[in-house]
Amino acid sequence: MLHRNFMDILTRIYERGMYVEEINTNGYFLRQGVLDQMKERGIRPLMKISFDGIGHHDWLRGRKGAEEDAIRAIRLCRANDFPVMIQTNVHRHNLDTLLETAKLMDSLGVWKMRIIRTSEAPRWKENAGDAALGLTEYYDRMLEFASAYMKTGCRMDVIIWQFLRLYPVSGSYGMIPVLYREKEYRDSLPVCKGVRGMVAVAANGNIFPCHQLSGTYELNGDIPGNVKKESLKHLLSASQYLCEVCTTVDKIREHDRKCRNCKYFKYCAGGCRALAIVLTGDKLGADPSKCVFFGQGYYEKTVSALQEYENYTEIAYNPGIDI
């Protein structure tokens, strides 16, 4: 929304038979005039607004007043009937405010909240030190949050990154590490379903499989392509980028001994490539967070903690065995 021709760009997108599903924003540039122009053009995307915890948003965004601006933008969008999803980074500094933050967002009419473990990206480690939650710490504290949140009476759905989806209205939940159930796995599945449907393009034109990996790829000089130097058509039909996003899960199992010998592989399919790269430096390595989840019994712990609710990712296996 920072671009001076933002509305013209939106208009041209729709003129070409495409549409905008969502807009990611910190809320600063959201004003009534902007929403009026969108409504006039029949444009009503999901507004994904960053909000990183009551009393902590200003610190993470590096600007005094950022929290107030975000809340103002949320209220404005809801008053104009635009759907809102909140994206919240969780770390050791704001962890204790998470439940109150969720209740506030629900009271503002937010449709969904996505809680993201702030991972070990280069800039985060440089600026925040050891504020990132360890993997077991993340699972333990998010499970405490999930159990408490489901009892609040809130209606807002919550996604806990790489862990849980909570649906309080229907009284159900799903475990994200369980990508596939017993009869769903096959070797030809993509290593990441998300990157098959979304292209990450940086302001400089560099293209990446995943926005969360842009900093790591840039730091390593690993650039699969650039839309200012090559056509998007070429990049999506015959390129290094295409080879990377079309990699199948059997390549992970062939490459990584741990995955090859793991009885849980058919459930997680090697896990998240972003986490595997950030935590191990290996594009085809095991995602350590999934090894912790299955190997340390978090499937069973979650079923126990949320036993009052329906688990729509129920699988038949004996959890808690070290891998």
Regions found by a protein language model. Give the residues of each.
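C-terminal accessory region of radical SAM enzymes
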Residues: 136-179, 206, 212-260
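Radical SAM enzyme core and accessory elements
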Residues: 173, 202-210, 215-222, 227-230, ...
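Short, solvent-exposed loop/turn segments at secondary-structure junctions
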Residues: 29, 54, 91-93, 120, ...
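Short Pro/Gly-enriched beta-strand edge/turn motifs at strand-loop
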Residues: 178-186
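Short, small/polar residue-rich loop motifs at catalytic or cofactor-binding pockets
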Residues: 192-196
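Radical SAM/AdoMet-radical enzyme domain recognition
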Residues: 3-134, 138
